[in-house]
């Protein structure tokens, strides 16, 4: 009989929600596994007691679907106003082996282009790949892949759009062309959770997350709530780009996410070697320096595969 592990528990209950929109996974802690017996606590501070009991029964029913489970113990806790919050367990994304972020502190450096290139190249190498466009306020992935359709849903799950053999999800699929998304941080963070965890991924080897610029709420939400395998940093030769990228590097180092490497985009136009300088200063591998060419811009505008123009030495950095 196989041993139980925490991921099985999280996967089974991750879609259970309270009426206020709180996901059960956001308020559980102290997961204990002893043989075939499992238990954990639910923080029901501010929740209706009857609803909490309904949620508990739903969780028990879902967990009983795991054949190895014998006994389930779920207890309720309530935090005192000044009580330090117990660190939440990080979520695994169902049916995804590895999650790689593509990030930069600076906007307009080509994160979406590089996210697309990485995904396309991995797909050509026979990996199963998906992309989450996490740039809520400026989604570019639908344009790069030429997608103009709204994803279907099945059994309450979002079915990602398939383009160039890559599974793709973006907030851009759900808004009208050129419409501004005017959301505060908590709403944007909740949307990211839904794009990651409510989407029905099909046994992916890699999920690439195209991050927004900056180091704000969305970054913290993803970093604090998900098991991640690393981040690729994108920069350009300009000094102002380097300044913002340093802030991004600082964020990922403080939160202990492995920085897999740096890609310098729009290279060779200026003498400043931002990617090489950052690589040496922070002891981070320089994966590649990508030239700025009209062909790359044209490929993005016409939704053509970027792998016809470029190849990155990815595999030794993503293992």
Swiss-Prot record:
It comes from Rickettsia conorii (strain ATCC VR-613 / Malish 7). InterPro entries: Mrp-like_CS (IPR000808), Mrp/NBP35_ATP-bd (IPR019591), NUBPL-like (IPR044304), P-loop_NTPase (IPR027417), YlxH/NBP35 (IPR033756). It comes from the Bacteria. Keywords: ATP-binding, Hydrolase, Iron, Iron-sulfur, Metal-binding, Nucleotide-binding. The gene is mrp. GO terms for molecular function: 4 iron, 4 sulfur cluster binding; ATP binding; ATP hydrolysis activity; ATP-dependent FeS chaperone activity; metal ion binding. Belongs to the Mrp/NBP35 ATP-binding proteins family. This is Iron-sulfur cluster carrier protein. SUPFAM superfamilies: P-loop containing nucleoside triphosphate hydrolases (SSF52540). ATP binds at residues 105-112. HAMAP family: Mrp_NBP35. Homodimer. Binds and transfers iron-sulfur (Fe-S) clusters to target apoproteins. Can hydrolyze ATP. Gene3D superfamilies: P-loop containing nucleotide triphosphate hydrolases (3.40.50.300). PROSITE patterns: MRP (PS01215). GO terms for biological process: iron-sulfur cluster assembly.
